[in-house]
Amino acid sequence: MPRSLKKGPFVDKDLMKKVDAAIANNDRRVLKTWSRRSTILPEMVGLTFAVHNGKKFLPVFITENMVGHKLGEFSPTRTFYGHAGDKKTKAKK
């Protein structure tokens, strides 16, 4: 179920402080964050975040198409190595 409109989008307070400081200083450094649950706001467009995926920080450059989504959507947490194939069918081909 989506979040109520009267509540507004959720953004971690500490993350918003970092964003406001980066905008005020015209600083384009990568902002490191663990807050995957924060919603991307229009003020964040053009900034780069290093979003933690559980193991390392992945750089995410924010574009206009990402507004309204969560930061965690752009930092995958699982690695897919593919399904194990049948060795006999591979040898025949």
Curated annotation (Swiss-Prot):
Keywords: Ribonucleoprotein, Ribosomal protein, RNA-binding, rRNA-binding
Membership in a protein family: Belongs to the universal ribosomal protein uS19 family.
Protein name: Small ribosomal subunit protein uS19
Organism this protein belongs to: Lawsonia intracellularis (strain PHE/MN1-00)
Entries under SUPFAM superfamilies matching the protein: Ribosomal protein S19
Domain of life: Bacteria
Gene Ontology molecular function terms on file: rRNA binding; structural constituent of ribosome
UniProt-listed GO biological process terms: ribosomal small subunit assembly; translation
Function: Protein S19 forms a complex with S13 that binds strongly to the 16S ribosomal RNA.
PROSITE patterns, per the entry: RIBOSOMAL_S19
Listed InterPro entries: Ribosomal_uS19 (IPR002222), Ribosomal_uS19_bac-type (IPR005732), Ribosomal_uS19_CS (IPR020934), Ribosomal_uS19_SF (IPR023575)
GO cellular component: cytoplasm; small ribosomal subunit
